[in-house]
């Protein structure tokens, strides 16, 4: 059995479901490439009583054909090709009734692809669970889908026979930096923390992407080989990623492109204006689907109301694509090695590092010793017309402290000069004036290598480095 990196909570949930004294219906969901199938197959290893997967963009007859071949694999008796999903699940019931396994694990992968356009698969699944499986004590039904929105809308929020039937929901997110480090160690990939952070800025914590890194090459060489070479495995990933995850993905792509042009994010109205989409529920649905799939985040500026909330693109690969690969504008197969340290890469790195930090807020709170405290997390940007100011991360603490966190990427210890010290102090003053907070404000600086000590560094009450993100 291959070692599973991280995923301790998810593995425990699956183990508890397996040991349960009643039949359970478990759904594992999350963005494409995050390791859902691998997790379930490795967790149950040789315990699977049945496994079948859907096929992307194929019709009902083709889906039934693949399901039939899966049935034949697990059946001791010859089977006829089912003419409907109801017949297919009836055949599955007979296979499970003949199984001698104490707990019969049924794993159905890429559920949304199986369902296709006519939806008859879901109706048959309802019948299978409600009329047979749920009445027993020996069935563990595990379903997966990369189409997070489909799972939520069609299964979790089902208004028919599946309403309230899912017993466990496991949302699989990308790896944290600590889990990535464990992954590299397991793969014998030598990489210091700076390169691991840089890798996260490019690939996120997506296991499938990380599995392509070759231990014999440097990170820069791997980036060039995977992303900039015309035949690189991830050179055309953007073209496939959204189409595979979302049915009718054109509006998703419109919104993502609009967000990529505005680092701090956009309000819903700004998104509609930038994309030309109608002010209707369909736009809200697309935004929800992108958020539920870990491509964007929604946040409210400190002190602002929900109607002022912002949507921000956070998916590392997508951000990288729009900076360097969009429209095939880059023909240099060794672009990364040729441009390391240049303004083009440095300007991207500042924002990409900020997103890495925002993905590790729990680790930041732990490093600051406030993980057990009630803390509200937000960003902040000034509404003033004359003096513009923005704060990357605001931690509003129950002990009447507000941490104003500045995030800076640097290849060496970061130096605060007189001008920047004045900027930080002025920004705090504007924050206090506009928000009218009665709490004490403290400046926090999170950098790659810490601060260079000088006469101005003392204005920072708390200093964090990239090492604190690896907790």
Language model regions located:
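Phosphate-binding site recognition
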Residues: 1-339, 343, 443
């Amino acid at each position: 059995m291959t070692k599973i990196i991280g995923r301790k909570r998810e593995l425990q949930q699956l183990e508890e479901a397996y040991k349960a004294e009643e039949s359970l219906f478990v759904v594992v969901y999350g963005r494409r490439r995050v390791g859902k199938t691998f997790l379930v197959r490795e967790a149950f290893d040789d315990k699977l009583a049945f496994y079948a997967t859907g096929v992307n963009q194929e019709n009902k007859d083709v889906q039934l054909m693949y399901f039939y071949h899966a049935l034949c694999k697990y059946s001791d008796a010859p089977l006829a090709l089912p003419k409907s999903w109801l017949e297919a699940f009836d055949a599955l019931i007979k296979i499970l009734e003949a199984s001698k396994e104490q707990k019969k694990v049924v794993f159905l992968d890429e559920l949304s692809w199986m369902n296709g356009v006519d939806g008859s698969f879901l109706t048959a699944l309802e019948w299978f669970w409600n009329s047979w499986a749920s009445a027993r004590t020996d069935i563990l039904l595990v379903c997966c889908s990369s189409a997070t929105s489909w799972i939520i809308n069609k299964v979790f929020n089902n208004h028919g026979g599946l309403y309230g039937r899912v017993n466990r929901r496991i949302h699989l997110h990308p790896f944290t930096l600590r889990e990535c480090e464990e992954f590299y160690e397991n793969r014998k990939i030598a990489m210091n923390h700076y390169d691991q952070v840089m890798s996260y800025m490019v690939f996120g914590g997506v296991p499938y992407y990380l599995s392509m890194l070759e231990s014999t090459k440097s990170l820069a060489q791997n980036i060039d080989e995977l992303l900039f070479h015309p035949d690189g495995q991830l050179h055309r990933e953007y073209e496939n990623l959204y189409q595979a995850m979302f049915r009718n993905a054109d509006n998703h792509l419109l919104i993502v492109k609009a967000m990529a042009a505005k680092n701090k994010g956009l309000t819903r109205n700004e998104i509609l204006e930038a994309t030309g989409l109608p002010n209707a529920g369909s736009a809200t649905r697309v935004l929800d689907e992108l958020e539920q799939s870990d491509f964007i985040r929604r946040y409210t500026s400190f002190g602002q109301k929900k109607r002022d909330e912002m949507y921000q693109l956070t998916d590392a690969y997508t951000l990288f694509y729009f900076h360097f690969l969009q429209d095939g504008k880059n023909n240099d197969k060794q672009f990364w090695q040729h441009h390391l340290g240049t303004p083009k890469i440095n300007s991207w790195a500042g924002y990409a590092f900020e997103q890495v930090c925002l993905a590790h807020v729990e680790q930041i709170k732990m490093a600051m010793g406030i993980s057990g405290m009630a803390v509200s997390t937000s960003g902040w940007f000034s509404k003033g017309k004359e003096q513009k100011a923005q704060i990357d991360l605001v931690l509003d603490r129950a002990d009447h402290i507000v941490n104003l966190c500045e995030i800076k990427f640097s290849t060496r210890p970061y130096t605060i000069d007189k001008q920047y010290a004045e900027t930080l102090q002025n920004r705090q003053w504007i924050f206090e004036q506009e928000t009218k907070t009665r709490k004490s404000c403290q400046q926090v600086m999170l950098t790659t290598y810490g601060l260079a000590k000088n006469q101005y560094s003392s204005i920072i009450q708390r200093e964090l480095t990239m090492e604190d993100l690896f907790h």
